[in-house]
Amino acid sequence: IMPDIIAPVIPETITVHLGAPDSAAQNVVVPFVDYIKNVASSEIYPTWPENALRANIYAIISYALNRIYTEWYRSRGYDFDITNTTRYDQAFVPDRDIFENINDIVDEIFDEYVVREGSIQPLFTQFCNGTTSTCAGLSQWGTVSLAEQGLSPLEILKSFYGDDILILTDTPVPSVGESYPGEPLRPGDDSNSVKVIQTELNRI
């Protein structure tokens, strides 16, 4: 029997390890939206064209959600979702200033992420700066020239990750209060509420 596919949700928080995976570094629990704002402010420049910023922020969101959804670190026995070192993940700098335009874009699109067509799993949107380092994924500086050519955020992303990608929007953002379905769960229930709670229990 195939297990039920649990659709991703936007988590309230993300646990960030402030160092390499095996280092004795501190873990910090950060609201997911604030984490995305911090990473975007640490990884890209606020003066870039807006569509370049949006493409990069989509990649940052999708990368973080992929780490959470696949339980990349937790399935390996770690007690965190992601690290803050760019050797392994994406930059997160505690207590840094957030750029106003990045703040506003993240508030608008934090519940949107990249997938392959036919999939609901957040895409592993690897990226690098495209100057001092290159990789198979997105080139951060490369997004600038593409945005200047008039490409949309999705067109920019397709140029790096392939034409078979989509941006899923309006991803659910359940809070602890919202995960109660409004009526008691009973034996034999097979609703999405059961699946949400099963997923939460599996993560404990």
Can you say where each PLM-predicted feature lies in the sequence?
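Conserved, single-site charged/polar hotspot
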Residues: I1-I204
